[in-house]
């Protein structure tokens, strides 16, 4: 009897991203402060395979905005866990609204390079 491989968690998918590459991309962002939508866009653009697989984890939710929200939450948890390695620190958990990858405006965390 064949076994079906376990579905990877969002955390496992994000941990596939090379931390040094992500840290370098974050450090290349203009300015010292930025919101988490900037990092969402970096991951979507430079780590497209992982980003697409994250979206697939939440495809059952069907609504694209809800899927994006879930992916963003998981990326936020990842950033918080690996902030030191990424050389960033969170300076505000609910900053000013900014535009996300869906073109919608939502509140997001503010981060600073360290």
Task: Indicate where each model-derived feature is located.
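Phospho-regulated, low-complexity intrinsically disordered regions of nuclear gene-regulatory
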Residues: 2-28, 37, 42-114
